[in-house]
């Protein structure tokens, strides 16, 4: 599913029909000192292929809730991130290792990472950040985050809770008063 797909749309294409959506708040303090609840949700499911067993977590955020607390149904939650834990199955001889995946799949397909911090190979393009790391000989972890959704969150917070945003909201509210 593309970034910003809403929760119901993504749920309709997940192969596992027994998924449970978990909702939680992520509190964030603005520069002005306001504590905001950022509405988040996540879905976990498993996918098994010929060579791997994957545990996939899809992370969603409700940017619209920052603008108005009435925007709280599932269609307002948009895809923000994906985390995969990939376990390599026993392939006999030759046995694939996490190092093989990093070397022959990640580096060959994505090239030199923008950054390597000693643990994570970090790639970035205009839309997302892609991070991959070796957990052990048979397990890797992949994290993908949408930069566009992150910017949407920052813009919504700035639009609503900055000094200019608060003044703008006050002007809109005053327009509704007849004197």
Where are the predicted features?
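Non-cytosolic coordination micro-motifs
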Residues: 1-39, 73-179
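N-terminal segments of secreted, surface-exposed, or virion structural proteins that
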Residues: 34-36, 43, 49
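Compositionally biased P/S/T/G-rich terminal and signal peptide-adjacent segments
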Residues: 46-75
